[in-house]
Regions:
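Lectin-like carbohydrate-binding module/patch detector with strong preference for beta-trefoil
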Residues: 1-195
Length: 195
């Protein structure tokens, strides 16, 4: 989805007008009204080889993860956590699906990121689930606020890095950092040095 393709960082606001927040315990994910907190900012990573899958990284450097752990015994919703797995697997992948001006984030299980409401323990909780009742259909809809935009250079650098990975590395040329003519400016594509 194009909004995530151009975003470096986003905030997600639920139907309850609360932001998806990474808790200080560096494991839990909840909803809060304060969207200006750093913990409400999620860095966007486009999954290599995919045009429609993303990973979201918290302010604590952990990924938004669709776990297999039940939120409550007997309930269908599963916990959404912050994790830092040794291997980046599909539990970290989210597929953004546009729904008018809003977005649904779909897991590999076919569930959707859901900001829950109601009485505790549901209030402010975040799960992934399929909404079965019409009353909770909107709970899977999120407003996306772009906090940081990728620069054009970042996009071309990312594209350039991707191309470099597909090509064999070129041989390294020996160059001394002092290879210049004294008293004259030295110029390269990226740097300018003058004595």
């Amino acid at each position: 989805m194009e909004i995530f393709q151009k975003a470096k960082a986003v905030r997600l606001r639920s139907h309850h007008d609360k932001y998806l927040v990474a808790d200080e315990d560096e494991e839990s994910v909840t909803q809060e009204r304060n969207g200006s907190a750093g913990a409400a900012k999620w860095t966007v990573e486009i999954i290599p080889g995919s045009t429609n899958l993303i990973r979201l990284k918290s302010a604590y450097g952990k990924y938004l993860t669709a776990s297999n752990k039940p939120f409550l015994l007997g309930a269908t919703g599963k916990k959404v956590l912050q994790t830092n797995p040794s291997r980046l697997d599909s539990s970290l992948a989210w597929e953004p699906i546009r729904d008018s001006a809003l977005v649904k984030l779909k897991t590999r299980y076919g569930n959707f990121l859901r900001g829950n409401g109601g009485l505790p323990p549901w209030r402010n909780s975040v799960t992934h689930d399929i909404p079965h009742r019409s009353a909770t259909q909107e709970w899977v809809l999120w407003h996306v606020d772009v906090v940081e935009i990728l620069s054009a250079n970042a996009n071309s650098d990312h594209h350039h890095q991707h191309l470099q990975l597909q090509q064999p590395p070129s041989p390294l040329h020996h160059s001394d950092s002092l290879d210049f003519t004294p008293g004259s400016p030295s110029r390269s594509d990226r740097f300018f040095r003058q004595e």
